[in-house]
Amino acid sequence: MIRKILNKVAGFFALGWLAATPSLAVNKGDLPALPLTELHKIDSVVGDGETAKRGASVTVHYSGWLYDPSKPQGKGTKFDSSKDRGQTFQFGLGRGMVIQGWDQGVEGMKVGGNRTLIIPPDLGYGSRGAGGVIPPNATLLFDVELINVE
């Protein structure tokens, strides 16, 4: 009887550990439906370095797509990538230098971490869009790698 109880308790702990483990990929069935109303953060790698905090200067690599839940991993048309250019991007976290979805989504990452951000229009470029590349009211998907925190 005690052995059965201990096995059940161990099973619950294992389920809790699995639930706390970040997914390594965004599965099509797990993608949020449109219209998106909140920021989604999915850690594929949790770094082990310094944590990105508001006010810090952070350096990242990123790739950005128009979010399309009908496409693999929700990645529609790619519109930008620091990786493709071979140049990192540095900005002041929480200082309004980037879209709100980035300020909120990068905060809390650890150096060495990789995070997917699915950003609703109101935390992105909203009704104005951007540069003829991002249409008005677009939901965005970014893969972000945190390189450094100063």
Task: Give, region by region, the residue ranges found by the protein language model.
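Cross-family detector of peptidyl-prolyl cis-trans isomerase
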Residues: 2-150
